[in-house]
A protein has these predicted regions:
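Hydrophobic side chains within well-formed alpha-helices
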Residues: 1, 34-35, 80, 84, ...
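N-terminal signal-anchor/signal peptide hydrophobic helix marking the start
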Residues: 6-12, 16
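Residue-level signal for discrete positions within transmembrane alpha-helices
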Residues: 12, 113, 117, 153-156, ...
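Short, membrane-interfacial amphipathic segments enriched in basic
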Residues: 1-3, 77-82, 93-107, 143, ...
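An internal, D/E-rich "acidic patch" concept
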Residues: 71-133
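Hydrophobic alpha-helical transmembrane segments of membrane transport/permease proteins
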Residues: 16-82, 178-201
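Alpha-helical transmembrane segments of integral membrane proteins
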Residues: 2-3, 114-115, 123-147, 163, ...
Length: 347
């Protein structure tokens, strides 16, 4: 067991290096970096100053010495290979550097924004599984019934609607866009949150998070529900279930004591992808749409502004979380089904 865990931890290193290397290479060829943006601002300021002072267009060139200072400020005065090795050295120490534009360390920004993304990700993840797993089991037990057909139609329609489209629709309907002002447009708490009672704080938080979570969760039901249904149907048709029924065991006992554990294995394997999807991919769209100040919005703004330390830092963090949850998923796989050995997973 411990040898398997050690091997998996060691394999995380080349994966992280590969992700950082690919991102670093892409950054070298993306136009409009921080130096170019700063030069444009200087040219714009010089033009406006010249037009105001002299009534004519000013010279828009920038002193080469200023450009050299900007490159030194953002670390672009060194060759790419040297910058690459310095980046790997810093990330090996978990030093993510400082933001170009926010005048804070990347770690402090992540710590500030992380609670919002965790809140959205956990709500989405747990609500998806708490609703979809029982629904999938009910559909498997009632396979082919009107209930099965109706719920399949509902979850597939929800799956077909992108989360950001549903979010826009919810804002238009319930956020004061064109109809009812029932929910707030942005943020997770009200301005007077600190003055509210404990019950008032809980209700205020749920009031703010209702629309973002609805937009994030609805499209996630179909995959987990249908996976649960198909896994249970596959197990129900197996010989050991027929044997258990022949012995006189009740349907509930057969379903929960024998079928449930085996049918849950595919779902456990999908936990990391579902968690990371809810934690990052979903939060990126939902946070941007609802102006929630989390890691998703921070990542989006950093890409737009070419704030490379924040881009690399958040990508490094999400990759690390994804690899760790994948390892935890494998451990849960063995915990649910003791017949599976770590030696088999290694092969």
């Amino acid at each position: 067991m411990w040898s398997y865990i050690l091997k998996r931890l060691l394999l995380m290193i080349p994966t992280l290096v590969g992700v950082l290397t690919l991102t670093f290479v892409v950054i070298q060829f993306v136009p409009g970096g921080p130096v170019e943006q700063a030069v444009q601002e200087l040219r714009k300021g010089a033009t406006e100053q010249g037009a105001t002072s002299f009534g004519m267009r000013a010279h828009t060139g920038v002193d080469p010495q200023q450009i050299a200072q900007l490159k030194a400020l953002y670390g672009f005065d060194k060759p790419p290979l040297e910058r690459y090795w310095l980046m790997l050295e810093r990330f090996a120490r978990f030093d993510l550097g400082d933001s170009y534009f926010r005048h804070q360390s990347v770690w402090s920004l992540i710590v500030q924004k992380l609670p919002v993304s965790i809140s959205i990700g956990l709500w989405t993840f747990f609500l998806t599984y708490l609703i979809s797993v029982p629904l999938g089991i009910a559909k498997a037990v009632r396979n082919g019934s009107p209930f099965d057909v109706a719920t399949s139609l509902v979850v597939l329609v929800g799956y077909a609607i992108p989360g950001f489209v549903l979010g826009v629709l919810l804002l238009v309907l319930f956020g004061g866009g064109s109809f009812w002002q029932l929910f707030p447009l942005r943020g997770l708490t009200s301005d007077n949150f600190a003055q509210l009672s404990v019950a008032g704080k809980v209700l205020d938080y749920l009031w703010h998070i209702a629309l973002p979570i609805t937009a994030s969760v609805v499209g996630s039901f179909a995959v987990v529900t249908m996976l649960t249904k198909n896994a249970f149907l596959d197990e129900i048709r197996r010989q050991y279930v027929l044997t258990a029924r022949a012995k006189g065991l009740g349907e509930r006992t057969v379903l929960w004591k024998h079928v449930f554990r085996n049918a849950m294995l595919p779902l456990i394997v999908g936990f990391p992808a579902a968690f990371i999807g809810a934690f990052f991919t979903g939060s990126l769209l939902i946070e941007t749409l609802f102006s929630l100040d989390g890691l998703g919005l921070l990542s989006y703004e950093s890409v737009v502004r070419r704030d490379y330390p924040v881009v690399l830092g958040t990508l490094y963090l999400f990759t690390l979380i994804g690899l760790a949850t994948k390892l935890i998923s494998d451990l849960c796989y063995v915990w649910v089904d003791p017949r599976i050995q770590f030696e088999n997973l290694e092969r």
